Amino acid sequence: MSERQGGQEQRTEADGMTTEGISETSQTLQALANGLPADAFAVLGPKPLAEGRRQVRVLAPGAEAMGLIDPRGKLLARMQASAIDGVFEGILAADGPYRLRIVWPDRVQEVEDPYAFAATLDESLLLQIAAGDGQAVRRALGAQHVHCGDVPGVRFAVWAPHAQRVAVVGDFNGWDVRRHPMRQRIGGFWELFLPRVEAGARYKYAVTAADGRVLLKADPVARQTELPPATASVVPSAAAFAWTDAAWMANRDPGAVPAPLSIYEVHAASWRRDGHNQPLDWPTLAEQLIPYVQQLGFTHIELLPITEHPFGGSWGYQPLGLYAPTARHGSPDGFAQFVDACHRAGIGVILDWVSAHFPDDAHGLAQFDGAALYEHADPREGMHRDWNTLIYNYGRPEVTAYLLGSALEWIEHYHLDGLRVDAVASMLYRDYGRAEGEWVPNAHGGRENLEAVAFLRQLNREIATQFPGVLTIAEESTAWPGVTAAISDGGLGFTHKWNMGWMHDTLGYMQRDPAERAQHHSQLTFGLVYAFDERFVLPLSHDEVVHGTGGLLGQMPGDDWRRFANLRAYLALMWAHPGDKLLFMGAEFGQWADWNHDQSLDWHLLDGARHRGMQQLVGDLNAALRRTPALYRGSHRADGFDWSVADDARNSVLAFVRHDPAGGAPLLAVSNLTPQPHHDYHVGVPRAGLWREILNTDSAHYGGSNLGNSGRLATEPVGMHGHAQRLRLTLPPLATIYLQAEK
């Protein structure tokens, strides 16, 4: 390469002493100027010359002039435009720090030379990622604020092993793919430190595939994103969030006495909307949602996926930004403030987290470096036919490290109290949603996805080890054994599993006309056959109020009075049933219509007394749960439950006793699921003395007919239903009652 001096070309020492060396440097610079694959660090930045001098080359297409300045702004040397468009060259007479003064058509920029810095990524971190370490992903990849010496900036790092070239493009370089090619590291990782880049800058990676295509990709490990439908990643804030939830975090003890778990499932974008039908931001959600959840007595909020997702109609279940809260509600710090406020209010936060699949949007993970990377190359393994999405390659350590890092990011960085892992069944089976011949057996010829099993165990092991007390809840719709069993016993290691069977059976029963229920009584009782096989959550979730089904209230049979009565009885039966509770927003006040993700819940319904009564009932159910150890201490233990009446199908009545394994007062729950009241109905109970009716869904407070048991009842010393005593009860129509033994 030559530098132009007075119109004459003179070879410099940095170019090498042979024509081959000059040609090679020229070719490299020309390739860089054309945005083609080449080693930028071989020719750009400072290169030593004789007598302590250095030659500096800079690639700045579109610049009008350039100089080299010292840290105080004094000119050290003027740079000359070379014969290669966009390349500037200059000579520094002495060693020492320098900066670039770049004259653009609209401004003058002073900044350090990114190609003057050595690699900043520790090679051991990259090896850890290649071995499947999620924490290493968090420390190494994405846009990280770092200092090189005393120079602040952002280190960009990404995994793209099939790429010929990767460059960072963004607001800081005019989105010019030529400006900032990255340094290639071992294992297919790429990195570049860009001085003085600030929080809020938008960026992407320009990835040159093996076939020469240039793909503009969002950062898989971006901590912040643009507001969809825009797709760029955003450099996050460098400042650490100031948490105020130390007391909550200290009390998150997995060894503590079992506590109530009652979850309010929320789609943040449609719980309530502003006057322009736009989603609320995190501060407004904190101001409105948290007191509401406190008032109703739920212990946790479970958020439908807020990981960034391009399509709002996916409800968040097709995410591409697994490390970033969606920009629909504001900044990442805004989300941290929301979680912090929840914790101060005594409410836990669970995130619906999707590790089963991802969409094929062009800016996302699909064919990230021009080839199958995060997904399988074979569509029989890599394509999810039910959802037209792509399946993660769980057999690739870098991919599982990416997923593990995401889970750990939400738990550690955002102080989340649990993850509900979506679509676990689709992960566990290679033939999920596939016909014969459309799937690839595992190494043993079976249908189990052994790599996914290993990943889920690793996920649960790491969370339990690093963050004891954090919940991991599986949405698993099959009979896979041991979902919540210990990994050492061959289980998957989740803390909880959604009881989809209970939901389908009982909701199906409640949707029937009461005249038909006698023939389907087993739908109410069968769940107790397996109720203690796993640590179950009973879910009445978003999936039950979409696709034309109507809200839970609208799915109940009969006239309006009976619909309300049916739903009240059902919810009270659910709260008494073994297992933890989950209720989707809107059900607590009896929303009639389908859930619509594009609009607010129908809050105006609370102008009606029956809807207010439903809401009051849910609050009272949570209050009963909190103050009645028999309802939660034995939720996952067979000794916490006894049948009293399981076989009265003719009257559609069932009754059972919940026990406190610590010896507290037992509770009797009785449901009459016909509109016919029953007087002098005998039910066996385990303890003699007075039993007090503590909840009756037929109470006038809730909109019922106010038939009940007038407070307290004394037992009769007559054995019944396997118990030594019995109660003579009045069973109101379409109602559930709770009675608790008094001391």
Swiss-Prot record:
GO terms for biological process: glycogen biosynthetic process. Its EC number is 2.4.1.18. Residues 1-23 are annotated as: Disordered. Keywords: Carbohydrate metabolism, Glycogen biosynthesis, Glycogen metabolism, Glycosyltransferase, Transferase. It catalyses: Transfers a segment of a (1->4)-alpha-D-glucan chain to a primary hydroxy group in a similar glucan chain. It comes from the Bacteria. Pathway: Glycan biosynthesis; glycogen biosynthesis. InterPro entries: A-amylase/branching_C, Branching_enzy, GlgB, GlgB_N, GlgB_N_E_set_prok, Glyco_hydro_13_cat_dom, Glyco_hydro_13_N, Glyco_hydro_b. One of its GO terms (molecular function) is 1,4-alpha-glucan branching enzyme activity. The active site is at residues 422, 475. Pfam families: Alpha-amylase (PF00128), Alpha-amylase_C (PF02806), CBM_48 (PF02922), GlgB_N (PF22019). One of its GO terms (cellular component) is cytosol. Monomer. This is 1,4-alpha-glucan branching enzyme GlgB 2. It comes from Xanthomonas euvesicatoria pv. vesicatoria (strain 85-10) (Xanthomonas campestris pv. vesicatoria). The gene is glgB2.
